[in-house]
A protein has these predicted regions:
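An anion-binding catalytic pocket shared by soluble metabolic enzymes
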Residues: 134-223, 316-344
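Pocket-forming structural segment of enzyme catalytic cores
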Residues: 489-499, 504-508, 512-604, 608, ...
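Acyltransferase
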Residues: 388-422, 595-619
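Conserved hydrophobic core element of enzyme catalytic domains
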Residues: 263-391
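Flexible gly/pro-rich beta->alpha loop and the following alpha-helix that scaffold active-site loops
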Residues: 424-425, 432-507, 614
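Non-catalytic accessory segments adjacent to catalytic cores
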Residues: 18-22, 28-146, 188, 221-223, ...
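Contiguous alpha-helical scaffold segments within structured protein domains
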Residues: 78-100, 139, 200, 208-298, ...
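Cytosolic ligand/metal-binding cores
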Residues: 27, 43-46, 185-257, 337-381
Length: 619
């Protein structure tokens, strides 16, 4: 079949150019067939191309504005491949014009939203980072199938480094884009995720290693990427049978910009549809922790997200009959209606160091990048020759290697359980799936682990009956806000386990703050949130490099420290009185996250803590 036949064939179609690992060439794949809707991911067929909207995250019980965007699947009746050069010859090459154009949320309004998120959400302990979207809107007069194919051709010609370049035409809606980022890939039981964060936008005169090195040394960019690696490791530890391994960092070079990225790999025995469900959706397009990020998105964004930050998902089977899944994140994508209305959603990642004006500029640059790549907005003249690969510069390689050395070695290799500690730990999840990573860390010390959410029926009784250590895990929110039912319950639970549980309790981040409050220490809001910060501290007399994700902290002065010491309780604190850790008969608490990739020796810290708790009696 000739690609030009798609102009007259009324059936839905998809054209995909995928970067398939292990293949030297990456042809254009053509899928033609009917499109139908489904309610849940579990209803997807074994083979087909799914369009997964952001609202589908409701399957995980997360808050989301339901805009009615359907979960669709194209079931191929015909499929074939075309070499790239042949596809370029046969696809329409005419110019596509966009009229009007502007953001649905103005610059001043968006800057105000950014400021509120920084102050109220990140400053209020609701999370480490959040992605807030606005949408560039315009109109393509007389839009039709030929225009969709012409836009796809422009992307094939002008973009490089994309993971998927695609056009999907459902009959009444067209998605065309070049996504740089894997949502999740599964083949032969191996699951791969690809957290990307940090963007070096090429200057008008072109990219240089010197400019790139400045970008690679930017602390804000480093923290952004580290935070999303942690967030996606949470997902990998949920779907992976033995956790995950961090590969990288690497540089992803595209036509107009470059990104820093990692790859996460793990083994999974789950069904591909379950893997897809448990990985909805990446922190790079939501925030962290993801569940609370969804609440923040619902509170601050205007309207629903449609397919933005959702995923395409190509399901199939390999020659041996094993399930396969290949899924890019739906970013850098134009969503075009049958009436020619064009929507280009873009988001900025807000972290503690963000400036509202800078994030406004970021969304302008991202929208312009998509429209330029599509050829509907003028860009810089194309270079006469291919740009040199920046990643080949020895200084760039050294800078990337330096970032890797700042990650916990535990997460850089496949892990096997040790036999340092025996028993069964019960982990209480306070709405942050850092507990999945924490459980993996605990298993690595030799413990069996069960994770239960704080709001599960019967949790309090289960905790008191548990004959092993209890871990009060992390979670968003203000630990002093007893008007919050979650905090009221967790505060009471902390009091109960300290008094009545006889097998030891460890508090992590929020759990630590709850224990500290029960010890009589003051809990205060930090002047500057400490979200995604890697710092060297003195931990009970020895130096440790650890990762913090907190907006609140316990404070302890000299007098309070002496009083606690008289009761056998040690306090590890900074010079300003902020408490890093506490430990006493039958309990311990750490403000930092030992399970984070930012804590270099977290497994040893947890192993030592559990060893001290073993057989101890609570106060």
């Amino acid at each position: 079949m000739d690609l030009r036949d798609l102009l007259s064939d009324p059936r839905p179609f998809a054209l995909l150019r995928r970067r398939v690992p292990g293949r030297a060439e990456h042809p254009v794949e053509v899928l033609i067939g009917p499109v139908g809707s489904r309610d849940r991911l579990a209803e997807l067929p074994d083979e087909g191309l799914a369009l997964v909207p952001f609202r589908q995250i409701r399957e995980r019980g997360f808050d989301v504005r339901d805009d009615g965007t359907p979960l669709l699947v194209l079931t191929p009746e015909e499929s074939y491949e075309i070499p790239l050069d042949e596809a370029l010859r046969r696809l329409p090459a005419h110019e596509v014009r966009v009229e009007g154009g502007g953001f649905d949320v103005g610059d001043e309004e968006y800057a105000g939203i950014v400021g509120r998120v920084l102050k109220e959400e990140i400053g209020g302990g609701e999370g480490a980072n959040f992605v807030i979207r606005r949408t560039y809107e315009g109109e393509i007069p007389g839009f039709g199938r030929a225009d969709a194919l012409a836009l796809f051709r422009r992307l094939l010609e002008g973009e490089r480094g994309a993971y998927w370049t695609f056009v999907v035409h459902t009959g009444d809606r067209t998605l065309v884009g070049a996504s740089p980022e894997v949502h999740v890939r599964m083949s032969g039981g191996t699951v791969v995720m690809n957290p990307i964060s940090g963007t070096y936008r090429y200057p008008a005169e072109g990219p240089t290693p010197e400019h790139l090195l400045d970008f690679l040394a930017d602390g804000k960019e480093i923290e952004e990427l580290s935070m999303v690696v942690d967030e996606e490791l949470k997902m990998m530890c949920t779907v992976g049978d033995m956790g995950g391994v961090v590969v990288g960092p690497r540089l992803k070079e595209m036509a107009h910009l470059a990104h820093t990225e990692y790859e996460l790999r793990g083994k999974s025995s789950l069904d591909a549809r379950e893997v897809l469900r448990e990985t909805m959706f990446a922190a790079t397009v939501t925030g962290s922790p993801v569940q609370n990020a969804c609440r923040v998105i619902e509170r601050h964004e205007v309207g629903g997200r449609g397919y933005y930050a959702g995923a395409l998902a190509l399901l199939g089977r390999d020659a041996g009959g094993t399930q396969t899944l290949d899924s890019p994140i739906l970013i850098r994508t134009a969503d075009i209606g049958a009436d020619g209305r064009l929507r280009v959603p873009v988001g900025a990642t807000l972290v503690r160091g963000s400036e509202p004006a800078g994030e406004v500029a970021e969304t302008h640059a991202k929208a312009a990048g998509v429209l330029t790549a599509l050829g509907v907005r003028p860009g810089r003249p194309r270079a006469e020759r291919e740009l040199p690969r920046l990643a080949d510069d020895p200084r760039v390689r050294a800078a990337l290697d330096g970032r890797r050395s700042a990650l916990a070695p535990f997460w850089l290799r496949m892990q096997q359980p040790a036999a340092e500690v025996s028993g069964h730990a019960l982990v209480v999840d306070g709405e942050d799936t850092f507990t999945a990573m924490l459980a993996h860390l605990l298993r690595a010390t030799g413990l069996a682990v069960t994770v239960r959410r704080y709001d599960e029926p019967g949790l309090r009784a289960a905790v008191l009956a548990h004959e092993g250590p209890v871990v009060l895990g992390p979670g968003p929110g203000n630990p002093s806000d007893l008007a919050d039912p979650k905090m009221r319950f967790l505060r009471e639970l902390a009091r109960t386990v300290l008094r009545e549980h006889r097998h030891g309790v460890l508090g992590v981040c929020l759990g630590h703050e709850l224990l500290a409050a029960e010890l009589g220490l003051e809990i205060v809001r930090k002047e500057v949130p400490y979200q995604g910060a890697q710092t060297e501290i003195e931990l009970f007399g020895r130096p440790e490099t650890v990762g913090f994700y907190n907006s609140f902290t316990a404070r302890c002065d000299e007098e309070a420290a002496r009083e606690l010491a008289a009761h056998g309780i040690e306090v590890s604190r900074a010079a300003n009185g902020e408490v890093h850790a506490v430990r006493g008969p039958g309990f311990a608490g750490v403000q930092f996250h030992p399970e984070s990739v930012l804590t270099l020796d977290g497994v040893a810290i947890v192993g030592e803590s559990m060893g001290r708790l073993r057989g101890a009696s609570a106060v």
